[in-house]
Swiss-Prot record:
Protein source organism: Saccharomyces cerevisiae (strain ATCC 204508 / S288c)
Lineage: Eukaryota, Fungi, Dikarya, Ascomycota, Saccharomycotina
Protein name stated in the entry: Uncharacterized protein YGL015C
Any one GO CC term of the record: prospore membrane
GO terms classed as biological process: negative regulation of formin-nucleated actin cable assembly; protein localization to mating projection tip
Amino acid sequence: MEDTIRPLNYADIETSGPINLLETTNNLKSSLKKFSQKAKGSHISRERIHHFRKWKNKTESLSENHLKPPPDVDSLCFSNCFQPDALSGNVFLPPRSSNMYWNEKQLQLEMEILKFLSLNTSNECCTSDD
């Protein structure tokens, strides 16, 4: 029971009343000593702390990216539609790796859009009559 830290004003859990000031002080010193020993025993090198922080920052940024909602499909207009090469009907969007997508649904949607663009040589996707 040497790892147990007792309340400062009581000798043990079963005791119903406070103890004197000297015992309280001794309990406090004992508790601080135990905390100090545990802190020294669990010392982590600076290198491990650095790697942990890098890992934590990386995982936090990944989780933030997953929280972003996908863009509104109706408001999308590809930049290729405004380029001179796009007028000839040659629309080329480089393939992306699957980890750049929010989810499988968004990947499928973009693949359908790419199919539509490759079939539609007049680029009607960017000219709306609204």
